[in-house]
């Protein structure tokens, strides 16, 4: 029985932003890890993604979806899906971790390129454990570490572009040393725009107290990829007041579907539509862990809502 993602749009339509393409990711189905008993099997995720009306998908944690290029292409292709990019965690500030980082980034870049995609979303490791919230690294980088970060990011970006034709898109993240707007700007100001771009994650920018619209206006030429996400202002207040880690914040429901949170998706779409670039805009609503029947209806409602903001998903639904 096919999955039907049709429903009435929650808001009126507006002019479609022709330079933007909407997709989604395993994250929006509660997937954070390659393997976890609380996560959906990948075939159900792909079925529901297609059924919800999305055409583009990000690969998510390496090993969740098949890593054999032919198997992955078959699984994606038979559902009418396209790969927008890969996702990888890697260390930038510890030179002794470079070999380990370049190994996993290369694997993800190779798989990503095999599917015709051009972006690898790069997330530095968090300084808190995602499950326990325990702090396990420095929370801020000093000047020497920033110098290492810039050099390492440029080196990885250049190597991945030359070997696989992909661009590294740095993803600011909660509980990461690149989280606040000043930290994001410091990273961008010290890296090579030919090889390193920004994955603008609207929710994580808001989580870190940043201004998405300001970043788009001042660093628009560095934005190569987008995660669109909303955060609950009340949970953000709890994060600040109680010193919560991101894992606990997600359990409390910090990531919400539009239009419940910040930033306003319509404002983001309007600003992105002015950029001289074609951008993939991937829905990421962190839900880990969640009941298996929770993600699909949220994904349908989110696609409909964002379509009303001018973000087309490509796949037509009745």
Question: For each predicted feature, which ranges?
Answer:
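C-terminal helical cap(s) of enzyme catalytic domains, especially alpha/beta-barrels
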Residues: 293-315
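Conserved, mostly hydrophobic/aromatic
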Residues: 24, 49, 57, 76, ...
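Short, flexible, mixed-charge acidic loops at enzyme active sites
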Residues: 36-41, 126-136, 235-248
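Acidic (Asp/Glu)-rich catalytic clusters
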Residues: 12-19, 46-51, 65-85, 103-117, ...
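Boundary/entry segment of secreted carbohydrate-active catalytic domains
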Residues: 10-41
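Acidic/histidine-rich catalytic cores of soluble enzymes
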Residues: 24, 56-57, 151-262, 311-317
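Acidic-and-aromatic substrate-binding clefts and catalytic sites of carbohydrate-active enzymes
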Residues: 33-38, 56-71, 91-103, 174-180, ...
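Active-site acidic/histidine proton-transfer and metal-coordination neighborhood
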Residues: 3-11, 97-198, 278
């Amino acid at each position: 029985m096919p999955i039907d993602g049709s429903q009435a749009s929650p808001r009126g339509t507006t002019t479609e932003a022709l330079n933007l393409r909407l997709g989604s990711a395993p994250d929006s189905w509660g997937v954070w890890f390659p393997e976890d008993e609380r996560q959906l099997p990948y075939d159900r995720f792909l079925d529901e993604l297609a059924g919800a009306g999305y055409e583009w998908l990000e690969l998510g944690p390496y090993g969740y979806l098949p890593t054999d290029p032919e198997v992955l292409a078959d699984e994606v292709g038979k559902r009418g899906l396209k790969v927008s990019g890969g996702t990888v965690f890697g260390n930038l500030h510890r030179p002794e971790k470079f070999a380990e980082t370049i190994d996993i980034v290369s694997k993800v870049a190779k798989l990503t390129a095999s599917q015709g995609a051009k972006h690898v979303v790069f997330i530095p490791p968090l300084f808190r454990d995602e499950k326990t919230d325990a702090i396990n690294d420095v929370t801020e980088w000093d000047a020497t570490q920033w110098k290492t970060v810039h050099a390492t990011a440029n080196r990885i970006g250049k190597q991945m572009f030359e070997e696989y034709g992909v661009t590294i898109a740095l993803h600011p993240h909660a509980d990461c040393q690149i989280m606040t707007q000043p930290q994001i700007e410091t990273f961008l100001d010290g890296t090579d725009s030919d090889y390193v771009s920004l994955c603008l994650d609207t929710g994580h920018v808001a989580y870190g107290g940043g201004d998405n619209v300001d970043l788009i206006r001042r660093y628009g030429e560095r934005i190569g990829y987008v995660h669109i996400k909303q955060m609950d202002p009340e949970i953000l207040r709890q994060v600040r007041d109680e010193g919560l880690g991101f894992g606990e914040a997600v359990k409390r429901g910090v990531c919400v579907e539009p239009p419940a949170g910040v930033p306003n998706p319509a404002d983001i779409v309007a600003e992105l539509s002015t950029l001289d670039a074609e951008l993939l805009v991937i829905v990421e609503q962190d839900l880990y862990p969640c009941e298996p029947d929770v993600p699909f209806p949220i994904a349908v409602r989110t696609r409909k809502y964002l379509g009303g903001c001018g973000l087309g998903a490509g796949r037509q639904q009745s």
